[in-house]
Amino acid sequence: MFIIWVMIGSGYYTSSLCLKNVPVDFEKNGLYTSIFDIVAILVAGCLSPYAGIRKTLIFSGMGSIVSSSLVISLTEESSDSLAIFYTSSSRFFLSYGFAILYMKHAALFPTFFLGTSLGMCHFGKGFAMFFMPMVAEAEHPWPNIVLTICNTIWTAFAFFIIEKSAKELSEDEKYAQESHSQDSHQAS
């Protein structure tokens, strides 16, 4: 989970920074990728109760691999609309994957370790993002090659996620409620 979190976070940050290297109008590209980000987060929020984390991350990982690979193929002669679509779809899948990962994180860890695991994942993501501005300053295809490699790594790790069944989730919720009621009973 830590590797997936770090790779998605650093991939998102890299895609944000390397928008200026894609051969298209920067303002227009930034506007469309921001719109795609908002749509991705809304879709993730709507589908979150119905989608499993493993399948969703694999789907978004495959989409981000394909779209970031297509961004690598862009040249100065590429049409603006094609470049905008490729970069926006790459960001869409990264935003979708990160939103699902954030919302479903609690389903993968026991209640007592949830805060610790979120903190460790955020620390690792922050450490990896320290190096991403250096990557994004390279010439056009190289930041997107690194982005594609990051997307491939987290998609490969997503295949190994073991989800809890509905029964296990309800048992965890029941245990958390019992311990909460015991704590409030002892406080009074």
Regions from the PLM with identified roles:
Residues 1-188:
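Alpha-helical transmembrane bundle of multi-pass membrane proteins
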